[in-house]
Amino acid sequence: MVREDLRNIAIIAHVDHGKTTLVNEMLKQGGTFRDNQVVQDRVMDSGDLERERGITILAKNTSTTYNGVKINIVDTPGHADFGGEVERVLKMVDGVLLLVDAAEGPMPQTRFVLEKALAQDLTVIIVINKVDRPDARLDEVVDEVLELMLDLGASDEQLDAPVVFCSARQGAASFSPHQFGNDLKPLFDTILEHIAPPEGDENAPLGMLVSSVDYSSFVGRIGVGKITAGTIKQNMQVTVCDYHNPDLKTSGKITALYQYDGLKKSPVDSATVGDIVAFSGIESITIGNTICDPAAIIPIPFVKISEPTIEMTFSVNDSPFAGKEGKFVTSRQIRDRLYRELLKDVSLHVKDCLLYTSPSPRD
């Protein structure tokens, strides 16, 4: 079964090269929003810290439609500290848009995310963004990207990647570096032509890899992943297994099933091969688990989650300004908030510890 009505892509880039702005424009031109609807900038960055810093921290799922084809889009973080998010979500897609600033060219994180995409043999579409910058180096940057792909061992097919020139802020794209487009039609056409549609057997036993998790105070832990085989249905009994931990086998029931529809998660009764879905009902679910048919337990291989890159210690605030700023200022409240974050961020480690402070000479 080939899903010609579906494409799954991720947008990868160095921080501040315009990923989230491009997703905004793709959603607008794909008809996700009404003509009279006011759309805020960086609509995908929903977290307070993401909006404050102007960066993407957690990978986000959304979708739009072009010429009757649904395009599932994953907006990934561009900062090196959140590289683990990029590694995981690449398992859900069949191709990537590699976004590169027309003036800055490939940057350190560009190399990191591109290496991960090439290692998984994903189709790459090169998007040169911010072509309207006065210091843009269009031809040079294209050469730099191709040289980087060559250094990373890209195959001949990957080196033949199409190039689209784009201004995400103006919502315009073109195949020529010297001709400015009016909309993103060249980019959409390139996605449909070069990104392969998902394939699989919808009648086979269910197989789905959990690549991301979320948490809701209403339904509990939510797993997100792409169906690689079979069909998943609401109220279906499933078995959870893990490739790196073969002894782990638990049973569960899919109590709610959702697909991404623009910025919303819309409830559905069933989904099949190639669909990216979110589900609830299994509280122990975590990234790397396989959801499968109890009659055919086959774990799907998955990359191990990267270890944290930063370590922080929280201790009692003995500043003269202690307790005068912020809403939640006690150590118990901070601890509770960190443990709540563990429910949806499995790359985070939290440990309780006892800090001993030696007495001062006055004591």
Give the predicted meaning of each segment.
Residues 80, 93-111, 125, 131-139:
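Conserved Switch II/interswitch segment of TRAFAC-class P-loop GTPases
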Residues 96-99, 121-129, 157-166:
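Conserved beta-strand/loop subsegment of P-loop NTPase cores
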Residues 165, 300-316, 349-352:
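Flexible hinge/switch segments at interdomain interfaces of large molecular machines
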Residues 135-191:
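Canonical P-loop GTPase G-domain recognition
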Residues 1-100, 104, 144, 213-216:
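P-loop NTPase switch module centered on the Walker A-proximal segment
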Residues 356-363:
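Conserved small/polar residues in nucleotide/adenosyl-binding loops
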Residues 32-38, 44-58, 149-159, 192-206, ...:
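Active-site phosphate-binding and catalytic loops of NTP-dependent enzymes
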Residues 209-310, 322-324:
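Conserved nucleotide-binding/hydrolysis modules and their immediate coupling elements
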